[in-house]
């Protein structure tokens, strides 16, 4: 259960937009944070928490049962112009003008896969299932060596096992998503 709710009116608008996409699991994606280049420490941390869209290429194996939706804003969203082969991502971010718009779209999804960003926190606060891709030296708020968090019951942490190497958490998410999507579709 979440402790935030999006505007009912905005949720209804998103339900109309997404109404044809009912056969597959709806999964939101965020692969990069905001670098905050004006704050050196934040920019350095962002390099460790963000990835390129191509890093999520293994998720293409899930496309038969999953519709992917971009929740990525900012400059990293330009990577949608050349997504990894087979990773078809629906992009409605031009319709996101506020955090409430984002919350309403997330409310219509089944799952959010994200790096440690405000979108991940928003989705978890809404009670949405969140699979968080966390850097090797993860932020203190996620505690150490845990896959769960006391802050959000619906959030699962997939942490790097080696600095700057996303292969282990992304492959774990791919396997979990294959399993989860097959269960949801059956």
Question: Where do the model's predicted regions map?
Answer:
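Catalytic machinery of carbohydrate-active enzymes
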Residues: 1-186
